[in-house]
Amino acid sequence: MVLPFLVLYLTRELGFSLARAGSMLAVYGASAIVFGPIGGRLSDRIGALPVMRVSLVASGLVLLLFPLAKNFAAVAAMTVLWAGCAEMFRPASLAAITHVVAPEQRRQAFALNRLAINLGMSIGPALGGFLATVSFHAMFAVDAVTTLLAGTLLAITPWRAFSGVNSEAANRQGPRIGPATILHDGRFLVFLGGVILVGIVFFQHESALPLYLVQYLHLSPAFYGMLFTINTLLIVGLEVPIVSATAQWPNRRSLIIGCFLFAIGFGALGLIASPAGVIATVVVWTFGEMLLFPAMSAHMAEIAPENRRGAYMGAYSMSLSISLTIGPWMGTQLLALLGPVRVWFVMFALGALAAQLMVFSVPRRRQSHVAVAAGS
């Protein structure tokens, strides 16, 4: 709820310059890159559920205290704390899903997880915008309270599904796998490269896309907002059915097709100037999103050693954070350097390259039905 309005809060409430306020987003992104893998490693050591609980409670407390920070250094410190606490949740939650869901159902489970996230992201910014018009302090307070409530719910609910998951026992079983081992997994690193590239393309919807629509196609900000609504409605209505319908597909197929749909959807913007055409491109890359992201999480769950799922999910989370940190900046720079047409051809090339990296990094033998057989 707070993050989309952080720059607005810093400029209007605290009087920061736009450059200083914008730098806080970079601070948040850099912190996410660092703390995501830490959250994954902690999940392997103490269990995913404790990490999720601490992450939510600590994030809520930091949000309560955030308005007390008034100068640049204090705000930067609060932003690091906030990002550190919040971003440890993602790899822990992915590891938790992997632990409790059967291999043949993981892609659907990750799709349901994304459904919940998208519903929250559709409600949160709208509520945050309303609260920001009343009081920025109210916005921080409501976000803090809802986060604390989520942490409390996780703390008091008896999660029987986790009763058989003993991370310490898992650590004693099998070889110890540290960061150096992950770095020597060549296919895994190539896969992460594909994740970063397709993430850069995806996050253009936050930077180059709105600038292109408003400044070059002379469409209204309301039209850009409508595209978000279309994207969310498609995901809420179709992602789970699509993932269920393609459940027998190997992850490899979903990954490759998803990357190509991103490449086509964003690349076609260089050839289209009409509102209807723009809507069509959003539909195309949204279908890519619905295929790609559940399959990426499922592939991570499939290849990660049982006693290091958190570490692998942390590396995956870090890759997405890298994309989020550099993607919007890269898009705006390319838009200024190459112009409003060629920037989208670059995005097509990046998406196609990501698909090729998926071909190299996900061999045919690592297919979802193989994982089912191994897990049965």
Region roles according to the model:
Residues M78-L119:
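Cytoplasmic helix-loop-helix junction between adjacent transmembrane helices
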Residues G29-P37, M121-S122, T232-V240, L324-T325:
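Residue-level signature of mid-helix packing/kink "hotspots" within the transmembrane helices
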Residues A132-V145, Q333-G351:
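A membrane-interface helix-boundary motif in multi-pass transporters
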Residues M1-G29, L189-G194, V198-L227:
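Helix-loop boundary and gating motifs at the non-cytosolic
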Residues P50-L64, R253-G267:
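Structural signature of the two symmetry-related core transmembrane helices
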